[in-house]
A protein has these predicted regions:
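Hydrophobic alpha-helical transmembrane segments of multi-pass membrane transport proteins
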Residues: 16-24, 41-113, 159, 165
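Transmembrane helix-boundary elements of multi-pass transport/secretion proteins
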Residues: 3-69, 116-125, 151-155, 176
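Transmembrane alpha-helical segments that form the membrane-embedded catalytic/substrate-channel core
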Residues: 53-61, 133-142, 166-170
Length: 187
């Protein structure tokens, strides 16, 4: 993969995570001085890192995989080799997980110099990122396997991922939500 492709592939999602951290952390952080005894930007940083992992893995195994399957017909070409369909799907899982984990690790590296990594336990974050990214890569690929056309991803993104992102407790304490909203968040 060339440098330009890497930048076009990884850059926008990484910039989006940095933008969330800067806009929400510094913007709302100017009004919300602390949450649970820490600064607002410190509060949201781990959640933004986790969301970068989630969205990176999901994007790779939803829209991007759909295009590889139905538009570019990469899967058809791959199974004409000694690879089985299972091999190709596992490769998609692993690439989606790799991409999601890369976002998390790079984002963690950006957080550290700004004092947003509060514990040495953060050294285990890459492992958590890989597990989370693999989980979301499998979820994305599973949905993609049932999608008949690319418009079906609107349901997946706006009906499942966006509520999960917004109700997950990234931007405000999860326990402060009403009971019905906490149920949505736990789902």
């Amino acid at each position: 993969m060339g440098r330009k492709t890497v930048l076009l592939t990884l850059g926008p999602r990484f910039v989006e995570a940095i933008a969330y951290l800067a806009i929400m952390g510094l913007g709302l952080g100017a009004y919300l001085k602390s949450v649970d005894g820490i600064s607002y930007v410190q509060f949201i940083a781990p959640g933004v890192a986790a969301s970068a992992v989630m969205f990176g893995a999901i994007l790779e195994t939803s829209y991007n995989a759909f295009v590889r399957i139905h538009v570019r017909r990469v899967f058809e070409a791959a199974v004409t080799t000694p690879l089985s369909v299972g091999d190709v799907v596992v490769g998609e899982y692993l690439w989606g997980a790799t991409r999601g984990a890369i976002y998390g690790v790079v984002f963690l590296g950006v957080m550290a110099p700004f004092g947003l990594v509060a514990s040495w336990w953060a050294i285990l974050c890459p492992l958590v990122f890989v597990i989370g990214a693999l989980t979301f890569a499998v979820l994305g690929m599973t949905y993609t396997s049932f999608a008949k056309n690319i418009e079906h991803f609107n349901i997946f993104w706006t009906g499942i991922l966006t509520p999960m992102f917004l109700f997950s407790g990234i931007f405000f304490p999860f326990t402060g939500l009403p009971d019905w909203a906490q149920v949505i968040g736990w789902c």
